[in-house]
Amino acid sequence: MHDTAWSEVFRPGGLRLEEARPGRYSHLVFVCGPVHGEQVAGLHGTFVGCRRIAVGVTVIDPADPAVTGFDLVLARDSDACPPVRDLAAAAVAASAPAAVPVAGVALTTGQGEYGLRRRHELVTGPITGWLGGKNCAPVPLETRLDSRDWRLCATAEAFMALLARLDIVVTTRLHRLALALAAGVPALAVDPVAGGGKVSAQARAWGWPGLVPAERVADTARLDALWDWCLSAEGRRAAQAASARPDHDMQAVLDALVGGL
């Protein structure tokens, strides 16, 4: 039997180190991080009755009281021994990373042109709260191109390459919806305009069913159902079919533009 102490942010509701009662334990295992400083050294006084082991740690100063207080130190790197692979690699190998979807996320609080029909601030909270409960790897999506900012794509090709690597896009923005479908990636779109605005219109133009109106954003069952559908084989096929379908309306617009020049 063992207990694992977590950061309160990483595992809300889990056991925190400050809450662990030292008298209940025979051993203390400190995993990962540098064995250095007062916080680590304080463990030796708190858990004085336990056999204390440090594993997968960095040892900077072997004479540091934080180090010498352990009964056994199994370092990942130290001047006294060759480096070994970090324990995190073993945790990754034991999990199934392919089962966790990568989700591009693009929300907006702008679009003042919609005036009193705007519900942008009202829909963002429910979306982000709902997303926080999803086991996914979220990726913020920004279509603004800037060759001077390493955090942004410098070319349209780079942004489309990013989109193509996603499993799903969650968005309240027209261009993220359109570009996701153009890349064959399912999109869960929420229209932040009461009664429907340009996001709803774009979904209709693509014949795309993955849309939630602003009035239903608090319906987590609807969000969950669309999330599951987007990540299903059916949802992926629908997005790929939308991407491959010829757009005669767009061609008509381009022809009209050329004719008007």
Question: What does each model-identified segment do?
Answer:
Residues 1-261:
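Active-site anion-handling motifs in enzyme catalytic cores
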